[in-house]
Amino acid sequence: MGMRMMFTVFLLVVLATTVVSFTSYRASDGRNAAAKASDLIALTVRDCCSRPPCRWSHPELCS
């Protein structure tokens, strides 16, 4: 292989590695966002259940 061909292969490998790491990073962001939303919902329900007026208005949340 010539020097130019080796350099081209090197650039393709670097590009492929960057694309794979970028997409896996974005996927983990989505999972983290879903976990944070779930935690926020649980915190809101817990806060509602600790206050009697909210608990009486939403008994399905605090059963």
UniProtKB/Swiss-Prot annotation:
Q: Where in the cell is it found?
A: Secreted
Indicate the secretion signal residues: 1-21
Q: Which residues form the propeptide?
A: 22-46
Q: Which UniProt keywords apply?
A: Acetylcholine receptor inhibiting toxin, Disulfide bond, Neurotoxin, Postsynaptic neurotoxin, Secreted, Signal, Toxin
According to UniProt, the tissues expressing it are described as: Expressed by the venom duct.
PTM per Swiss-Prot/TrEMBL? Is not hydroxylated. Contains 2 disulfide bonds.
What is the superkingdom listed in this entry's lineage?
Eukaryota
One CC-aspect GO term: host cell postsynaptic membrane
Ser-Xaa-Pro motif, crucial for potent interaction with nAChR: region residues: 50-52
Q: Which Pfam families match?
A: Toxin_8
Offer an example of a GO molecular function term for this protein: acetylcholine receptor inhibitor activity
Q: What's its job?
A: Alpha-conotoxins act on postsynaptic membranes, they bind to the nicotinic acetylcholine receptors (nAChR) and thus inhibit them.
Report the sequence similarity comment from the record. Answer: Belongs to the conotoxin A superfamily.
Show the domain comment: The cysteine framework is I (CC-C-C). Alpha4/7 pattern.
Q: What is this protein called in UniProt?
A: Alpha-conotoxin-like Am1.6
Q: Which organism is it from?
A: Conus amadis (Amadis cone)
